[in-house]
From Swiss-Prot:
The keyword Ligase does not apply. This is Small ribosomal subunit protein bS16. GO terms for cellular component: cytoplasm; small ribosomal subunit. GO terms for biological process: translation. GO terms for molecular function: structural constituent of ribosome. The keyword Ribosomal protein applies. It comes from Streptococcus equi subsp. equi (strain 4047). The lineage of its organism: Bacteria, Bacillati, Bacillota, Bacilli, Lactobacillales.
Amino acid sequence: MAVKIRLTRMGSKKKPFYRINVADSRAPRDGRFIETVGTYNPLVAENQVTLKEDRVLDWLGKGAQPSDTVRSLLSKAGVMAKFHDQKFSK
């Protein structure tokens, strides 16, 4: 089963709000998911992102592939650097 970390759209029309979910790559965008690991609100001036860093690092360690947008959000939050350090420090 190929697992992806990607955004799921929530909110109302013209007011998007996203959950960062771990899901099977074959599932629909707003469909079935395995776990919610964070949120992203693009409407706030500083683009508010909340993450469960330990769970994100766990899923990345298990081989989950982040989407391009999620990879960008994780990089800005410093999670990808931590994952890289963990992976190559052994």
